[in-house]
Structures are given as structure tokens and as C-alpha cells.
Amino acid sequence: MTFQKQPPFVWRKPPKGDRISYVKYAIFALIFFLTCYYSAYSIAQLHNYRIIIPEHGGQYLPFHPAWTLVYISIYIAQALTLLAVRSKEECLAWSQSLCYSVGMATVIFVLFPTEQPPVEHLKELSGQWMDLYWVTATTSTKANAFPSLHVASMLCTVWYSTQEKPRWFSLLMYAWFLAVAYSTVVLREHYLVDVLGGIVVAWLAIMFSQKKLRGKSVDNSCTLKKPQP
């Protein structure tokens, strides 16, 4: 597999013959995430060992429930990735990067379960965004704060969505990533150190997925160049 020079595009429909593969890759990544995420949570409930991060040294920011909209916008970004990647192989690499992120994070969740920032005192607050905040918060589990899987998966998504894209588009996508990362802290889902951990996990996941993508490209190139009898 080699990437042929294509006219610049931001989003486009996948090639007709590859659309099912795109959807399968996305569904597999989702199922892998749900399986690992809730399995790690179940294991954490078997013991009381927890790592507590001290709330000082700039580890948290003031609470702003309106940022819930930005927090959940990651799902829009992931859906749009199916329109942004350049090929079926690149879509597979994106899916693999998500799975690598989840796999690495799950090991850490099991071995070093880290508690999220406390939110009990937020129950006293009211406002137009609080209902949405609590609905979103109920989907999260405990003892999996470090690293931030939300940050890791968003960075993988943005990276694969911006390959050979216009500069303005890449800047907007990375600004979107920063906004999502910021939202995890102001919504008291994570500490700043969790965000940094998520970035490291994403970097490793992208590196591993790219290595497999390049290896597949070399193999296919050799097959194409093989002389016919």
C-alpha cells in the first residue's frame, strides 16, 4: 500500500468499496474500548488500593460545567475521522492506535488505579449545564484517572485526521484537541498530570500503529514490483 498523490481534501466519503471496512474498524475499536474500560473497573472493585494525587501544585483548574459540550465533542471528532483518513489502511492504523492506547491505559488502570478529583461538593451546584454534566459524569468509572484515555484517544484521532491536510485545518483540529484536554481538567475528570500521561500514551500508540502501517506499505510495494512469470 502506498499513498498516491491526491487532491487536497478535508472530509470526504470513503471509497464505496471500503465503507464497510471503515465502519468495522471503528466498531472494533469501540468494542475493544468498552471491554477493557469496564473490565479494568471491575478488577479495581476487588480491592481498596488506590493512588491519590494531591490537589496542589496547579493540578486542577476552576470548575466550569459548560465545558461538558467540548468534552463530549470527542465523539464527533472520532466520527469525522472516517471522512478524514486517506485510505482503508490508514483507517485501520487509526483504529489500531486507539486500541493500543486503550491497551496500555488498561494495564496502568489495573496495576496503578488512580482516583479522579473529588466531585461530591459539586452536587450542591445548580445551573443550565449541571444536568448535562451529571449525565456525562455517570458514564465514567472510577480508579482510572491516570492516564487520561479521553486525551489519548482524542490526540490519536486528531493526528490521523490531519495527515496531508491544509494547514488551517490542522491548526483547528489541534486547537480542538487542546480544548478537549482542557475540558477534562475543568470538569474535574482529570488532573493535569493525567493529561500529560494521556499525551505520552497517544504518542506511543501512534508510533506503534505507524510502524505497522509502514511495514504493510513496504510489503505491498514488494508484491507490486514482483516480476510476473
Regions found by a protein language model. Give the residues of each.
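Membrane-interfacial alpha-helical segments at the cytosolic side of multi-pass membrane proteins
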Residues: 76-83, 151-173, 199-209
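Interfacial helix-loop-helix junctions of multi-pass membrane proteins
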Residues: 123, 141-146, 179-206
